């Protein structure tokens, strides 16, 4: 076990395994995400820091879309007593989600579906939708607009998305700012390493 100590770390009260940890290496031999779920993306830490300071998710039902390894959702479950469902179109990410849920002693539900097919019926039992690094191609902008509109037509009360500030994200954010229901904030963290980005809050 001591040989593994440098292969994981604790940030914001959650345990995170590095890529070289034996458990992650084992998963990578068995499960290979085909899209972008092969790592923890930086904007997850922007979301987590925002949640720590503003606490909008406490005791809420949270939908973590495009979840990847699911750290933002796991943070919500562990530190804010949220009921979390992780959503991704690539089922190969879910073993990584479940591994991190287990080492953090939380329960996470998983749904395999894409942004285009996540229905209002599936979203109606949730209050908050979150996402990190989920708008990186221009053709995703309209897809996410449609998803967010469906979310508000169901029971979702707010949508919170973090991003480094990619052009597609800025297009999405500006659209919701222009409609009068969106707000963009610059955000940065110093740990686990320096990260700068933007957070879009829609409510």
What is the meaning of each model-derived region?
Residues 1-203:
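S-adenosylmethionine-dependent methyltransferases
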């Amino acid at each position: 076990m001591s040989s593994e100590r440098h292969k994981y770390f604790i940030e914001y009260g959650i345990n995170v395994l590095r890529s070289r940890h034996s458990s992650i290496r084992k998963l990578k031999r068995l499960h290979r995400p085909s899209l972008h779920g092969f790592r923890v993306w930086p904007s997850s830490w922007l979301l987590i820091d925002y949640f720590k300071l503003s606490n909008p998710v406490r005791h809420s039902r949270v939908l973590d879309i495009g979840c990847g390894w699911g750290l933002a959702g796991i943070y919500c479950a562990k530190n804010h007593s949220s009921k979390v469902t992780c959503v991704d179109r690539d089922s190969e990410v879910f073993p990584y989600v479940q591994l991190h849920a287990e080492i953090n002693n939380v329960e996470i539900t998983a749904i395999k579906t894409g942004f285009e097919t996540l229905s209002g019926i599936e979203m109606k039992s949730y209050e908050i939708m979150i996402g990190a690094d989920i708008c990186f191609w221009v053709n995703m902008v309209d897809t996410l607009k449609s998803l967010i509109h469906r979310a508000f037509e169901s029971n979702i009360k707010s949508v919170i998305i973090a991003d480094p500030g990619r052009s597609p994200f800025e297009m999405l954010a500006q659209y919701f700012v222009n409609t009068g229901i969106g707000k963009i904030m610059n955000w940065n963290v110093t740990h686990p390493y320096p990260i700068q980005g933007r957070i879009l809050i829609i409510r």
